Amino acid sequence: MDWENDGYRIKNYRNPDGSLRSRPQNIQYLYKAGVSWGKVGQGASSFRYRSEGFGFNDAAPTLFGEEWKPLIASLNSKIFKELLKIQGETLNVTTGLVENLPLLGYWHDENQKIVEKIVDENICDSQNDWNSFETSWDFKRHPLV
């Protein structure tokens, strides 16, 4: 994405008649960390941490907020997988569908630190696994070498 000069070219991309061709939305969240998922897919949805520095779009919706660790833990739980089915999960998991899920306020109790530690460990394990493949930007060497 060409975001040079605060996205000037994108914000000012025009038709020959002078009307705007693009309308960037929610740019205050652009390149911020969040919880993302694939909008279209078969089987259970997988919610994942998306680090800073990446964009988002309709095909990979993203939730933003300070309390993302309990959120990602909740959304990947068996209970929420069942709630998604009840809500009518099809091939498309839209932001509206996720937004309507009842979120429990348990993350401000004594379990918060435990949940956050498990989330951190899972993210670290996933990153280490991904970085062991040459397609990763952070690839250093294959684990068998």
Regions found by a protein language model. Name each.
Residues 1-113, 117-121, 128-131, 135-136, ...:
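Polybasic, glycine- and aromatic-enriched phosphate-binding surface used to engage nucleic acids
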